[in-house]
Amino acid sequence: TKNEIRKNLILKRNQLSKETVQKNSNYIMEKLHPYVREAENIMIFMNMGNEVEITRLITLYPDKKFYIPKTLSDRNMKINLYDENELILHKFGYYESSSDIFYDEKILDLIIVPAVAFDYTKNRIGFGGGYYDTFLSRILLNDQNNGKNRNKPMIIGVCYDFQLIDYIPSEVH
């Protein structure tokens, strides 16, 4: 089940050494470079624990605008412009913005998505709240409704190699 996969992979990720996290994060930064270089408005996540250290992108690309998610009620998620001075610790252990100034997700060129697991058909397992699934569904629906008038943001999921698995049981959100 998804819950078993989630539990096992979080346990495995939590056992990684800091050196392994840094080495793997460096490798992932290199792989992201061509996409980040071309983008202006980039949504990242605020990594926590042993997740890929994606917030390094902020210092690597000071000329880019980075946006971070803020979780609201009803599986809703909006984006704030990243500002180090506005960060507050969320009850689940990650940082989010204290600001109530939200930006339209249509400005995003690149969305970097975390996961506990991905499979080869783009299914993902997150922490179980459904926030990213709802957010990404809305973006993809907006793209369909707007026809070809605008470019779709590129969506890239990041994880360690052991988090890429053959099959994730999919659910409709």
Where are each of the predicted segments found?
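N-terminal active-site beta-alpha-beta segment that forms phosphate/nucleotide-binding
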Residues: 1-107
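Surface-exposed, charge/polar-rich loops and edge strands
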Residues: 11, 63, 98-101, 106-111, ...
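Redox-cofactor binding/interface segments in oxidoreductases and associated redox assembly factors
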Residues: 44, 113-114
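Short glycine-rich, flexible loops that bind phosphorylated cofactors or substrates
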Residues: 51, 119-120
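Long, contiguous hydrophobic alpha-helical segments, chiefly transmembrane helices and signal peptides
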Residues: 94, 115-116
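Short polar/charged helix/loop
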Residues: 128
